[in-house]
Amino acid sequence: MKPLSSPLQQYWQTVVERLPEPLAEESLSAQAKSVLTFSDFVQDSISAHPEWLTELESQPPQADEWQHYVAWLQEALSNVSDEAGLMRELRLFRRRIMVRIAWAQTLALVTEESILQQLSYLAETLIVAARDWLYDACCREWGTPCNAQGEAQPLLILGMGKLGGGELNFSSDIDLIFAWPEHGCTQGGRRELDNAQFFTRMGQRLIKVLDQPTQDGFVYRVDMRLRPFGESGPLVLSFAALEDYYQEQGRDWERYAMVKARIMGDSEGVYANELRAMLRPFVFRRYIDFSVIQSLRNMKGMIAREVRRRGLTDNIKLGAGGIREIEFIVQVFQLIRGGREPSLQSRSLLPTLSAIAELHLLSENDAEQLRVAYLFLRRLENLLQSINDEQTQTLPSDELNRARLAWAMDFADWPQLTGALTAHMTNVRRVFNELIGDDESETQEESLSEQWRELWQDALQEDDTTPVLAHLSEDDRKQVLTLIADFRKELDKRTIGPRGRQVLDHLMPHLLSDVCAREDAAVTLSRITALLVGIVTRTTYLELLSEFPAALKHLISLCAASPMIASQLARYPLLLDELLDPNTLYQPTATDAYRDELRQYLLRVPEDDEEQQLEALRQFKQAQLLRIAAADIAGTLPVMKVSDHLTWLAEAMIDAVVQQAWVQMVARYGKPNHLNEREGRGFAVVGYGKLGGWELGYSSDLDLIFLHDCPMDAMTDGEREIDGRQFYLRLAQRIMHLFSTRTSSGILYEVDARLRPSGAAGMLVTSAEAFADYQKNEAWTWEHQALVRARVVYGDPQLTAHFDAVRREIMTLPREGKTLQTEVREMREKMRAHLGNKHRDRFDIKADEGGITDIEFITQYLVLRYAHEKPKLTRWSDNVRILELLAQNDIMEEQEAMALTRAYTTLRDELHHLALQELPGHVSEDCFTAERELVRASWQKWLVEE
């Protein structure tokens, strides 16, 4: 234990003179001397009750002793027979336990988290014991309050603020709200009271028992002003009245306060669960809610003005960088995102701060600095209050109390303590300003050039001149003014509330300032105003862009780079949330993590709610697509990686859709009984084309076929028994339905299943044996070509191995070179006649001569031609790796393979970027001449010459 500092050793002599006789100096331990020197409250309490010191020395405070509070208090109240006795025992118990807590805190015997827990649970124990004693007494006097069914009605108490959060400070008011479940009357009393009268009278007595000062002090100062309608409202409300108030009249600050609300005592009873469920939608909105930030900023402004008005300097709670700002930071995230992130719904600050860090809403460094600062400030606050059991957060100005705090906080002197305090509060202030801002930063923000505000609010005419647009060409200037005027006209047709108008008037000058700084201002503004038209009636999204300048900047740069992204954001504004975090926006999910991410995402949605499941799948896909496109635009993803990500994303979707369809089918029909003898589901999805070849683009559809290995005689084992093969057919139909159903977030993917045996005329799902037989005996050469780019994208190991074996067998069949060459060439010529050359003086990157399809046909031809001799050629299904294999197996010269690979990736890269620009896949005739010449030469060499 750290020895007392010099000023405190001198003060000890004063303490000794005050001590009563039973507490002789020589009988006191070093610990007792330290605590008695530090705290006048402990000194006075132990002087009045010397036996408490004996108890402290023989049974030192423990971190977990809060678990005994209920039993200890029950024992203390066991002989209480009247209200006066109740008040006396509650006060003595509170004082005795507070001395134990002060002892543990002063000597740092337990962590600060434990101190907060003990203080909070002590208050809860005292409140609940007082309530229960009074409820029994009131029931004896007036009868038991009951509902219409005769069921007894309890008084439920909501602990608010730090009490609710389990973070009560040493000397604190307690904020309470009283409620009872249902209307009715008392039964069994001398005269009947309605429940409102019963609980109001009981509530008044409870406040008196806790709050009224006596010769033993008080238990807690009780503050009831957080209840609906404040001091002018009823003291106790029914659940129905509470619900009506919060739904119809609940204000932002009340929502803020309700985050920490906790039901005191038995929190798992039926009525407690009902009350909790009733309040949750008010506190945690289903959608991300950015109105919170302005509300909290307004509250912070009020507090800052109050601090200035009352001259509250050196206030560690309300001052800049103080405890309140840490609470605001945490609650911003809770109120904005708590409805969608259950981990943010904790009432306690530290667990919520951990969840914020885990969700990457704050950097690890910022979160850790806030955690350390919070614990430092809370310890300092509690030590300060425990000196005199006084509710204060203002640092002392006298030398004695400064010396006390420096010693207890483990600093050599007061300047060292204040230096550390300043560092912590500076860290808090920095994070607070970045997130919420204050009056000063708002003033700077509002000082944005008045000309931009005029440009927006006056909607200047086309022939007006404005200096802020002077740098643009005359055409662009006219176009910008027209776009602004048209946008304002469009707004007049929409129903936008006063809050929406206010946010828009704040947002637009900033947006115009940023957009018009660009050379492509007119084009970018046209895309963004089209997006804004779609969201102006949804203030939440406007607030997002208004409150987060970084999100606005990302929106502008992405819309400038890609009309496809602008269209996606306009169609699905939920995606705007992705703009908040540049770390994830430009960093797509790891290719092997899509399945896990999607699984986690779907856990938020009830498994049995098909509509929400479908919506969640589509929202996940769109968010991931946005990230991939953003990384593509930023140049952090090369073309091959773009396709890899799009393909992995599609596979994760297929996985989830099959899972959903399977669960639904099994619930309806049971499982096919042949699965009892084997692992897996006996089902596979084979991806062809771009999916099979790892070459998906942004708007690619999925070429799929479905396989099963169900015997002819298999049946399902459910109550509604059906033929096993019929089960797999319905499963495939269900999968197609889940992909193609149009929800408010669109469809998932266009799916084309025409590559199955016999095409559109064939069965939607095929047995593995029938597929093998068809490929061996009926398939055309072009179907074998398609098989080159096919692979299982979902399926159990048995079926996957079977398909791979069939594919390998078909591809390694010996083929007559000339015949194969002719068939492949003629098929390509038919395709070209059908698809290519539709745009005069343009080059169709995919379909025209020298384009992507020619390269694909070259690789397919060479695999089918030489796989009989070189089976390794069957290993991969994508063109780039097939070209590598052709070089490695001495079919094609390495230089040619590399040149074709470069041409192929260059052309595909262009297709990706055209898609981002929402442009068709053709370019000027004089583009890519070198690549086309190279491809033509290879075509001639392999598919024309003998």
UniProtKB/Swiss-Prot annotation:
Q: Which Pfam families match?
A: GlnD_UR_UTase, GlnE
* Annotated region described as Adenylyl transferase, given as residue ranges: 449-946
Residues of the region (Adenylyl removase) are 1-440
What Gene Ontology cellular-component terms does the record carry?
cytosol
Q: Which Gene3D superfamilies match?
A: 1.20.120.1510, Beta Polymerase, domain 2, Glutamine synthase adenylyltransferase GlnE, Nucleotidyltransferases domain 2
* UniProt GO molecular function: [glutamate-ammonia-ligase] adenylyltransferase activity; [glutamine synthetase]-adenylyl-L-tyrosine phosphorylase activity; ATP binding; magnesium ion binding
Asked if the keyword tRNA processing belongs to this entry, the reply reads no
Report the superkingdom from the record: Bacteria
What processes does the entry annotate via GO biological process terms? regulation of glutamine family amino acid metabolic process
- Supply the InterPro entries for this chain: GlnE (IPR023057), GlnE_rpt_dom (IPR005190), NT_sf (IPR043519), PII_UdlTrfase/GS_AdlTrfase (IPR013546)
Reactions it catalyzes: [glutamine synthetase]-O(4)-(5'-adenylyl)-L-tyrosine + phosphate = [glutamine synthetase]-L-tyrosine + ADP; [glutamine synthetase]-L-tyrosine + ATP = [glutamine synthetase]-O(4)-(5'-adenylyl)-L-tyrosine + diphosphate
Q: What class of enzyme is it?
A: transferase
> Has the keyword Glycosyltransferase been applied to this entry?
no
**CDD domains named among the record's database cross-references:** NT_GlnE_GlnD_like
The cofactors it requires, by name, are: Mg(2+)
Q: What does this protein do?
A: Involved in the regulation of glutamine synthetase GlnA, a key enzyme in the process to assimilate ammonia. When cellular nitrogen levels are high, the C-terminal adenylyl transferase (AT) inactivates GlnA by covalent transfer of an adenylyl group from ATP to specific tyrosine residue of GlnA, thus reducing its activity. Conversely, when nitrogen levels are low, the N-terminal adenylyl removase (AR) activates GlnA by removing the adenylyl group by phosphorolysis, increasing its activity.
Task: Name the family the entry cites.
Answer: Belongs to the GlnE family.
Please give the name of this protein. Answer: Bifunctional glutamine synthetase adenylyltransferase/adenylyl-removing enzyme
Organism annotation: Escherichia coli O7:K1 (strain IAI39 / ExPEC)
